Amino acid sequence: MSAPRDLLPQDILVPISVGELMDKITILEIKSERIKNPSQLKNVVHELEALRAIRLRDIERAMLDKLSAELKRVNAELWDVEDAIRDCEARSDFGEPFIALARTVYRLNDERSRLKKAINLASGSRIVEEKSYRSFST
């Protein structure tokens, strides 16, 4: 990966996995589509452009694009579920719909983790994030 040329002293560069980079980009894409506040949107677009400027070498683009699209779908679904949870919270409604939504969050996060790992393996990322949770039965 190459670094942007216009780095400032306050910019922090840290090594991350390719999956983490793609996750961050997909979340920023969702934010850029959904955030309406102009000053917030400006910050989101700035960060998104900075991350998109990072070039990934020797990666099978078709596979990465497919996995990234799946990751974006999961992140968008997580966004919607989190919004619905906040709506329940605002109404102090902690019944069955709230419980179902809360359970959906960890299932979606498991899928998100699986996709990030698949991106890491497909891209040959030197850093591979690992998650470890107790398994659950459906």
Regions found by a protein language model. Give the residues of each.
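Extended, charge-rich alpha-helical interface modules
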Residues: S2-T138
